[in-house]
Regions:
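Conserved N-terminal alpha-helical segment that immediately precedes and caps sugar-phosphate-binding
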Residues: 1-205
Length: 205
């Protein structure tokens, strides 16, 4: 059993560290550059009186809600998710489930906002529709996907993060870890340790 546990967490770590970032044209980006694009877009939105919006289904919806409160409370960045039960059931009933997020973006999105679109498969119609609305409203878009490398969502963001796995658990946890890393590193996680190491190297030199 321990070998399987070790293999599980080794795989999760490998997939997260191996996350692939690309631009809208499919050009590979360094992961650090991908993080910078999201960070800069988030700060530009906040400074301009705009907001960050998160969308996802199922486990990805949980991630969206989790991140919206963390980006708001810890990052001091205006953020929201669209997972209210009344809104989802109303819009799903009236407009169809493919439109539950797109309709809310029509209500709330403004030029200069940022959309974080999360889908393990990268093929969820309601997520793709939400991105289309965000694009039409001149929002910045970051996507998080997995499963097939040719999924549609991966080609729709200003920056696109992809986890090379077809296992829901691995993809979802990696997506959450990446988003947390973007926020936590922006807030200075590890900076003091790095500065201390540099100081030690300079002293030794």
């Amino acid at each position: 059993m321990q070998e399987r546990i070790d293999a599980y967490f080794d795989t999760l770590a490998r997939l997260t560290r191996g996350a692939e970032a690309t631009d809208r044209g499919g050009k590979p980006l360094a992961l650090a550059r991908g993080f910078e694009i999201v960070r800069d877009a988030a700060h530009a939105a906040h400074d301009g009186g705009n907001k960050i919006m998160f969308v996802g289904n199922g486990g990805s919806a949980g991630i969206a809600s989790h991140l919206a409160i963390d980006f708001s409370k810890n990052g001091i960045l205006r953020s929201m998710a669209f997972n209210d039960a009344a809104a989802l059931t109303c819009l799903g009933n009236d407009l169809g489930y493919d439109n539950v997020f797109a309709a809310q973006l029509e209500f709330h999105a403004r030029t200069g906002d940022v959309l974080i679109a999360i889908s393990s498969s990268g093929r969820s119609r309601n997520i793709l529709a939400a991105v289309e609305v965000a694009r039409n409203k001149d929002c910045r878009v970051a996507t998080f996907s997995g499963f097939g490398e040719d999924n549609e969502l991966r080609r729709m963001g200003d920056v696109n993060f992809y986890i090379r796995s077809r296992e829901y658990g691995f993809v979802e946890v990696a997506h959450l870890a990446l988003c947390h890393a973007i926020l936590d590193l922006d807030m200075g996680w590890g900076a003091k340790k790095i500065e201390a190491k540099r100081a030690m190297v300079e002293l030794d030199g």
